[in-house]
């Protein structure tokens, strides 16, 4: 083992122990993409796969977890959206299958959800978009945090990964394992965040074009062709409708989302829907638009959620090779620093 590999192993030890994987690299949960095939491939290759529950019903999640278990006996997790109207039922499905790790995304854990997850012995991971929230989540009993910057694909916050990492890691990384996400495409960046105290990292965009990913060939081609500047954040058109920005490749669906926002804002105005229902309508819009892109391969009208690291995705390759490349780059970077 080289000096770089030895250093990398040492820096990833905490994340590896927490996840039960061989390397502290999680595959970010991406709706329609992060299903049994990619999740199992990720865990089988030594990383940590996450099922994206998204808008799934409890029955669908039940089948997806069971399906994943037929493809891997390694640990994997499930990512749940906090605003899902059947969140507690989804947590029960995870418990039934003894899922080892549950990620809650999209806001603070609703009352009772945290206890329900922990009661079944699962480890709970939450997103911390600010230091104050990170501290609050730790006090409430969360087992680990993901710090994700605005470079990420899909739903994003307003602050960059590098700034969030500098703000949050020195303050909380000794209390709980912290995984850094957003805009990571190479191992050198992984090494940098590990040096700052991260327990590991989470990448999504980098794994979309994995051979094992079921994303449509057109969807993968769009990623391989795209550069960082093509992955743009959606614009909020009505301040009364608090829509979380979404980063995706520019196409016709970018425009249709603006129209959808106007339509939902009007329904709010006319008192035809409550705020919670309005936000759910937006989420269902994304679920449908993503399906169009990922599954149907309609890259003009479907959503192409992608992070700014998309320019570093240059070909289709197996998950194991992507992980090996990232680990080699990270080890090389740490070796150079030792010199």
Q: Which sequence ranges carry the predicted segments?
A:
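Active-site entrance/lid segments in N-terminal catalytic domains of soluble metabolic enzymes
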Residues: 2-177
